[in-house]
Each structure stands twice: as structure tokens, then as C-alpha cells.
Design a protein with these regions (language model features):
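Polyanionic/metal-chelating signatures
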Residues: 161-311, 442, 448, 455-456
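Histidine-rich, glycine-flanked metal-binding segment
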Residues: 50, 54, 63, 67-109, ...
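Central antiparallel beta-sheet cores of small beta-barrel/beta-sandwich binding domains
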Residues: 467-543, 548-565
Length: 582
């Protein structure tokens, strides 16, 4: 596509212009143009095959390794996805692309310690008679088991189409501990890096943790029907796993004369995960839940981690004494927006809202290990704001940074490759123009597995948008090679800000900024051309059914039109009227 753009423009140049531009013979000029067009036409394909530089030197920056003291005026060398050196006088390889780090600060990539980012969306429940929700399928075992699917693996259910991958990455989160959702034993979590061309590229550690929930998949309207029933059910599942494991071991040792134990898929999956040293994540947000989690951890005799942890300020010393790590939910409690103003909250509820952000400081003071996770936060930038609240409540900034980097890596046993800036570790880095927890600081670059992503402030529209560009659009244009098409999947915010992806026969790219202002739009993608990031800018107008405009790259243009496949003009007109009414 992009090579065709240059061909179209270059081929239209007059002979005299070409002679003056190149200062050589017309034949030599055409050879140069042909070579340039060939290189640019291959650029998207090369990017997909690793055309991005493999060696980088970020020179003269402030480096915050987390595992050691801060380094001033230091250089970080990245080679083929791995940190090769971190030092003030690190030698720079000849093949490295040098990035000027003056005035910049390098941090380890951040880790969201418990989420479902990068997972396939859970199927929506279908309605039954009278609007009742259909119940999810049951796991078959000694009895029907609701929401017990431990054979599901996050490593097998990676969804590269999840747009949150880019959103989290742009906010500085290079790694997540992600799990399938739904039910009391939804599946096995995995450690994922947030970049890759294929699903398996994201997986850092496949069998990491077994999340447990005390909320049935169908709510308490279905079995087990109550909190006490859910607790009893979960305990029984672990008893079944223990019995099944022991019975299987006895049979394998001497199968003669012994009845063969029945294979049970759920038990086998849980036993296998435990053999792989997977942690068991137990819900524990308030004091009652935390002490209940103590009891469950004692009964199960497994390596347990508490998650929730927002009332840890009341029992921090007990948690530390038991050496139980805590994953702290950063969605701090707050008043419900639609709460009845006459329904005054209890004093305990008000105290909880006020003191929850102090839980990390209480745990740090007690000597407990903890990490942060997003919980119900949908905008990852809000996670740093939530961490800032915990800093304001007494947590040291260094401890806050550690809870976003090295601590989760240690909890999930990947600190040998993630969580700090050290030679030999995966090159997951974020580069900022200031202190990470300063609200004015901007993230400039992110590296995931050594791949560079430039982070830009989104363009803002000047006028309210006339219509909504959300949806898939077919872009049509003509190059000297013939007609070509690209599919652009757009999402538009209420203020007209655009995001999305472009897919073409020559490669794929993410939209790094864009907007619809009145009836005028613009969006930008960035691709590597000859090893350098290059902007490709789409601009034009929207008449309610069609987009028309031009694609510009390195000062050269080609015209395009875009329509929504399979959508009638009347439907688009109605949507536009609705957008105008907004």
C-alpha cells in the first residue's frame, strides 16, 4: 500500500523536476525511485518479520533499576529483546540505534498483577424463559460442579484482538498476570507480555496461578446458593483433588488388585497446576474475608496469595506473620454515584473509604510482600493515580514502584527475567520525561520484549464531531500495482477522539492518534521504513455515509474513499443524525 503511494506520486513527476531533484540522468533517477519504492513496499512486511531494529542504546538517561540504586547519565543497551548492559560507560554496539536519553528516566515495565487483559471475552449469558439468565455449563465430576473449569488456560486463550493490550501498554504496563473469568475455579492464569505477532509470543509463564472466587458463575440464585454454600463447595473441591491425587499415586505404584480410580478432568487440571507450583489466589478484601482466607490457606496446604487486600490496614501484622503475599485492588472504595442521598453510609463504610489507600503503607511497615492490580479499573492510567493515593497515605514512592514491578515478578516467580532493569533480563522498559508518579509526567517510549513503541498524546478535535466513525471501514485506493483495499476498525470517543487498527495486504498497524472534528477527520499510523519510524497520515471529510480524503507519507499523497461494508446509506444517515443529536 505505502510503496504504491510513493509510486503514484513519483511517477507523476515531470522529467525536468526529476533531473533537478537527483542531479543525474533520467535513467539513474528512475533506478533510485524504483529502489525506494521497492523498499517502502516491503516495509510493512519487514515490520511483521522483525524489520524493526533489534539493537538499541538509550544513552545519557536516568535509570531506575528498582533492584539497585538510581543511575544518572547511564546507558541501557538492548539486543534482540534482552537487556545486555546497564552502566554509565556501557559500550555501544555499531549496529545499535542510539536514542538520546538526556532529560529522560527509564523504569522497568509495569506489571498488572491480576487481570483478564488479553483474554477471549466471556460468552454473554443467553436469556431463558421470562428473561431469566441461562446458567453456564456445569463441570461433570462426582457431582455437578458449577463454574469449575480449571482446565482452561490463559496461555491457550490469548486474544491478540483485545484492544486493551495496546491501551495497557501505552500506559506503561508491559506485563500482566491474566486469567480466564467466570465461576469459582475459572482457569489457570499466565504471565503475559503485551506484544507479539502470534498468541504464543505473549506467554512468559503459562501455569502461574489458580484464581478462586466465592461468587458462583450464575450468582447466588444458583447452586451453591449462598456464601456459606460457596465456601463449603470450594473446600470440597480441594478435598476431592487431594483424594484423587493420593488415589492416583497408589494406583500408579501398584495397579494390580486395586480398582482403577476414575479420571476427573477438574481434579486432574488442578492437581497438574499445583505440581507446576501454581499459586492459589484467594479472595480477601475486608477483615472477615482475610481471616477466612487464613483458614482456607491452612486447610489446603498450598502456596496461597490473597487478593483484594483493601482492609489490610487492620490486619497487616497478621498477614506479615503468615508470610502471605497480597495483591491489592487499586479500585479504591467510593460512594456509589446513584446512591440514595437519604441513605447515609455507616461509619465503618466511611472509614473504609478513607483508610483503604493506607493499606499498602501498613503492609510495607509490617514487612509483608504486596503488589498492585487493576481490579475494576478500565483505564490503566487511573492505576497510577490510585497508586499516588497510596503514596499520599504514607507509602514510600520506592515501595510503590516496587509493587508495580519487582514485587509481582517475585510473587509469580518470574523475577529472574522481569521486574527490574538488569543485564540478562527481558527488555521491558518505559521511558518518561519525569517522575513516574508526577501527574504531569508523560510516557515517551515503551519497550516490550525489546520492541519499541512510541507513545504520543492523542490529537484533540476542535469542534464537536458530526456523526460517529465507530466500526469497520473499507478503504479503497489505486496504486501503480492496481486497486488495493485496507480495513480500518475505528473506535470513537464522545469527544471525537479516534483509536483503532488498520489491516492491509501489506501488513497491520495501530492508530496512534486521530479525531473527527465537525465533518473533518485525521488519524495517523506509524510504520518502520528503512528502520526508522514513519508516520502515515489519513485526512479527509465525512458526509455521513462515506469518508473521502488522502493518505500522506513522507510528503507524498494518494486519494482514497471509505465505506462501511454491508451497511446501507440510509442506516448511515440515521446514525449520523443520532450523532448530531448527541
Amino acid at each position: 500500500m505505502f510503496g504504491g503511494i510513493l509510486t503514484s506520486r513519483c511517477c507523476s513527476m515531470k522529467e525536468s523536476a526529476m533531473r533537478s531533484w537527483f542531479g543525474r540522468s533520467r535513467l539513474f533517477a528512475w533506478h533510485l525511485v524504483a529502489l525506494l519504492v521497492f523498499a517502502l513496499a516491503l516495509a510493512p512486511r519487514l515490520a511483521a518479520q522483525g524489520g524493526e531494529p533489534q539493537y538499541f542504546a538509550i544513552r545519557g538517561a536516568t535509570v531506575v533499576p528498582v533492584s539497585g540504586p538510581r543511575l544518572e547519565n547511564a546507558t541501557v543497551i538492548v539486543a534482540r529483546g534482552v537487556i545486555k548492559a546497564v552502566a554509565k560507560d556501557a559500550p555501544i554496539p555499531d549496529e545499535a540505534l542510539v536514542i538520546d536519553g538526556k532529560g529522560l528516566t527509564i523504569y522497568p515495565g509495569l506489571i498488572d498483577a491480576f487481570t483478564d487483559v488479553g483474554m477471549m471475552p466471556a460468552p454473554a449469558p443467553s436469556g431463558g424463559e421470562g428473561g431469566a439468565h441461562a446458567q453456564p455449563p456445569l463441570s461433570r465430576g462426582p457431582e455437578d460442579r458449577p463454574g469449575t473449569t480449571p482446565w482452561r488456560s490463559a496461555a491457550d486463550e490469548v486474544n491478540l484482538a483485545d484492544k486493551r493490550i495496546e491501551t495497557w501498554r501505552s500506559a506503561g504496563f508491559t506485563t500482566v498476570v491474566s486469567s480466564p473469568k467466570g465461576g469459582m475455579f475459572p482457569g489457570v492464569a499466565a504471565v503475559l507480555d503485551l506484544d507479539g505477532e502470534r498468541n504464543g509470543d505473549l506467554v512468559v509463564k503459562p501455569s502461574t496461578a489458580i484464581p478462586v472466587s466465592l461468587q458462583p458463575a450464575g450468582g447466588f440464585t444458583s447452586f451453591p446458593g449462598s456464601l456459606m454454600g460457596a465456601i463449603a463447595y470450594v473446600r470440597q473441591v480441594w478435598l476431592d483433588v487431594d483424594w484423587s491425587t493420593k488415589a492416583g499415586a497408589i494406583y500408579q505404584k501398584n495397579p494390580r488388585g486395586v480398582a482403577r480410580p476414575r479420571y476427573d478432568r477438574a481434579n486432574a487440571a488442578l492437581a497438574e497446576a499445583l505440581e507446576d507450583h501454581a499459586l492459589v489466589l484467594i479472595p480477601a478484601n475486608n477483615t472477615t474475608q482475610i481471616r477466612r482466607a487464613f483458614d482456607l490457606a491452612d486447610r489446603w496446604h498450598v502456596h496461597s496469595v490473597l487478593y483484594g487486600g483493601q482492609m489490610s490496614y487492620e490486619v497487616a501484622s497478621e498477614i506479615a506473620a503468615r508470610k502471605l503475599p497480597v495483591l491489592i485492588d487499586l479500585k479504591w472504595p467510593e460512594a456509589e454515584k446513584d446512591a440514595d442521598p437519604d441513605d447515609a453510609p455507616s461509619l465503618r463504610a466511611l472509614r473504609f473509604r478513607d483508610r483503604a489507600p493506607s493499606s499498602p503503607a501498613a503492609l510495607a511497615k509490617a514487612g509483608a510482600k504486596f503488589a498492585f492490580y487493576s481490579g475494576a479499573i478500565t483505564a490503566p492510567k487511573d492505576m497510577l493515580k490510585a497508586v499516588k493515593k497510596s503514596i499520599d497515605a504514607g507509602l514510600a514512592p520506592d515501595a510503590a514502584l516496587r509493587a508495580l514491578t519487582l514485587s509481582p515478578a517475585e510473587i509469580f516467580d518470574v523475577a529472574d527475567r522481569l521486574g527490574s532493569i538488569e543485564a540478562g533480563k527481558i527488555a521491558n522498559l518505559i521511558i518518561t520525561d519525569g517522575d513516574l508518579f508526577d501527574e504531569k509526567t508523560k510516557i515517551k517510549l515503551v519497550f516490550v520484549d525489546g520492541r519499541r513503541f512510541e507513545i504520543r498524546e492523542p490529537e484533540k478535535p476542535k469542534d464537536p464531531p458530526k456523526g460517529d466513525l465507530t466500526g469497520k471501514w473499507k478503504f479503497s485506493y489505486t496504486t501503480p500495482e492496481g486497486p488495493e483495499e485496507s480495513i480500518v476498525d475505528l473506535s470513537m470517543a464522545s469527544d471525537g477522539t479516534l483509536s483503532g487498527t488498520l489491516s492491509s495486504p501489506r501488513g497491520n498497524a495501530n492508530i496512534i492518534s486521530g479525531y473527527l472534528s465537525a465533518d473533518k477527520f485525521s488519524f495517523t499510523i506509524n510504520i518502520p521504513i528503512e528502520g526508522s519510524p514513519t508516520d502515515v497520515i489519513f485526512t479527509g471529510t465525512f458526509d455521513g455515509t462515506t469518508m473521502k480524503g488522502s493518505i500522506s507519507v513522507q510528503g507524498l499523497d494518494i486519494d482514497f474513499t471509505a465505506t462501511k461494508p454491508g451497511r446501507s446509506g440510509a442506516a448511515d444517515h440515521v446514525a449520523t443524525q443520532q450523532g448530531d443529536a448527541r
